[in-house]
Curated annotation (Swiss-Prot):
GO terms for biological process: cobalamin biosynthetic process. The keyword Mitochondrion does not apply. This is Cobyric acid synthase. Pfam families: CbiA, GATase_3. The active site is at C342, H447. PROSITE patterns: GATASE_COBBQ. Residues 261-455 form the GATase cobBQ-type domain. Catalyzes amidations at positions B, D, E, and G on adenosylcobyrinic A,C-diamide. NH(2) groups are provided by glutamine, and one molecule of ATP is hydrogenolyzed for each amidation. Keywords: Cobalamin biosynthesis, Glutamine amidotransferase. NCBIfam families: cobQ, PRK00784.1. SUPFAM superfamilies: Class I glutamine amidotransferase-like, P-loop containing nucleoside triphosphate hydrolases. InterPro entries: Class_I_gatase-like, CobQ/CobB/MinD/ParA_Nub-bd_dom, CobQ_GATase1, CobQ_N, CobQ_synth, GATase_3, P-loop_NTPase.
């Protein structure tokens, strides 16, 4: 779509009173709503802290990483995702350590800097990325992070009100009313902002409301009388809006549609990554998805899934400390299905070898006769591959082509000593996927398996709702629940 308006794009920004207030899904809904109005739209989030990342286009015919939320927002906007949409991505590796990704590429230098020093270094690149998107689009939908009123962080802010001021954005402040204290959250956040920043708040949004909306009166009008800012939307609770959660382990309520025939337990280790790729399983009829943190959590499971990890050796040690290693081994010995993705694949092998200080050494779970060597260079690329002659429990994947992506430091191969004795894993994709001789343990580097419709049909004989249908539903929902003309006024020139 071509730009339809002269001059830089109007910016609409979604701020929240807290983390988890609903910024990401609302920004996604706005992207599709404005795109449906015939406008050229792009998403933007200056800084994201998440181990959920996607591979997108980067300058110089390269590929880079951005947060998953901005990737999905770009799709909602009918835009091609690129690294400018999330110029700074922080990927936590420990409680006090993050890998810094600037414009899609890992920066070892920035990763070593303290947060306050780093923020001043990266602001010029953040501002340039936003300015470039504004020059190319009619509307840029900006997502903030956490709360804009964290007064201890205000001087080093690069993601909330500094962005709002730079973009002269019209801001929505959203709160989770289901938590309680919504009006205090809204007023307190507004009151803590400097006067010039309060002026950028165009409307308050009450999210996750349950009950009779009439019972809110007279609070919305009282809040407007105190602040001059109207409540422009009251949005009902959505237990499953269909989008992956941006951070943490997503809500598992209502994960089975119809009678349960497949129980899938996903191991939730501390540094789990790319967990959003399992979101489509929540919508597959008959599938019950659950998180596993103890042996009791995998009892009765048909599948056990080891997802990606930002700290494979440390998460494997955690898994052993919980006793999950024995539970997984017993499940596999009974013929139960085990799936490892990226870091999970590495854990399933015989050994982890780290000579460059990326992750750590240690023995694997020994369910695949493979060995992984960690490298300083990170593999980041989209990948389309076809499964080879898959056998056993995963045989329905044979011949299925998958469009996915790779994000990993490790390189995995057959264990030389075991191969010499005839214990060889069946390679299903060159350098990407392997299966044990019994056929029930599968490991692969390729992320995005369950986001592929062909895979869902092969494994479950069913389709999940398409992302496009999810985006349309979100856009229709905000059109119903915002005050008339409020959305159009936000994006007006």
């Amino acid at each position: 779509m071509n730009k339809t308006r002269p001059g830089p794009a109007r910016c609409v920004m979604v701020l929240g009173t807290t983390s988890g207030a609903g910024k990401s899904w609302l920004a996604t809904a706005l992207c599709r709503y404005y795109s449906n109005q015939g406008l050229k739209v792009a998403p933007f989030k200056a800084q994201n802290m998440s181990n959920n990342a996607r591979v997108v286009a980067a300058p110089g015919e390269q590929f880079g990483e951005i947060g998953s939320a901005q990737y999905f927002q770009a799709l909602a906007a009918r835009a091609v995702p690129d690294v400018r949409m999330n110029p700074l991505l922080l990927k936590p590796e420990a409680d006090t350590k993050s890998q810094v990704v600037l414009l899609g590429q890992v920066s070892d230098e920035l990763s070593q800097l303290p947060w306050r020093g780093r923020s001043q270094r990266v602001w010029p690149q953040i501002a340039a990325a936003l300015d470039a998107l504004r020059a190319e689009n009619d509307v840029v939908v900006i997502e903030g992070a956490g709360s804009p009123a964290e007064i201890n962080l205000h001087a080093s802010d690069v993601v909330n009100m500094r962005v709002a001021r730079h973009a002269e954005a019209r801001c929505l402040l959203v709160t989770d009313i289901d938590r309680g204290g919504a009006f205090a959250h809204l007023f307190g956040t507004w009151a803590l902002l400097p006067e010039e920043e309060r002026a950028l708040i165009a409307g308050f949004v009450l999210n996750k409301f349950r009950g009779d909306e009439a019972l809110l009166a007279p609070a919305p009008q009282m809040l407007q009388d105190k602040t001059g800012v109207p409540v422009v939307a009251t949005i009902p609770m959505q237990w499953n809006h269909g989008l992956p959660e941006e951070d943490g382990v997503f809500d598992m309520r209502s994960t089975a549609v119809g009678a349960v025939h497949t129980r899938i337990a996903v191991v939730a280790y501390p540094r789990i990554s790319n967990l959003d790729e399992f979101q489509p399983l929540k919508n597959v009829p008959g599938v019950r998805l659950s998180w596993a943190r103890s042996p009791a959590d995998v009892e009765g499971a048909d599948w056990i899934v080891l997802p990606g990890s930002k700290a494979t050796a440390a998460d494997l040690a955690w898994l052993r400390a919980q006793g999950l290693d024995a539970a997984i081994a017993a499940h596999a010995a009974r013929g139960g299905r085990v799936l490892g993705v990226c870091g999970g694949l590495q854990m399933l092998g015989e050994a982890l070898i780290d000579t460059v200080g990326v992750d750590g050494n240690g023995p694997g779970l020994g369910l695949l006769p493979l060995v992984t060597s960690f490298e300083a260079t990170k593999t980041v690329r989209p990948t389309r591959q076809c499964f080879g002659a898959v056998q056993g429990a995963w045989r329905h994947l044979a011949g299925v082509a998958v469009q996915g992506y790779e994000i990993h430091h490790g390189q995995t191969a057959q264990h030389p000593a075991m191969a010499a004795s005839g214990d060889v894993a069946r390679e299903l994709m060159p350098g990407l996927a392997w299966q044990n001789p019994a056929g029930n343990v599968l490991g692969l580097y390729l992320h995005g398996l369950f986001e592929d419709a062909a895979v869902l049909r092969a494994l479950f004989g069913a389709d999940a709702p398409t992302l496009d249908a999810v985006f349309e539903g979100l856009a229709a929902g905000i059109a119903r629940h915002f005050e008339p003309r409020a959305l159009d006024a936000l994006a007006a020139q």
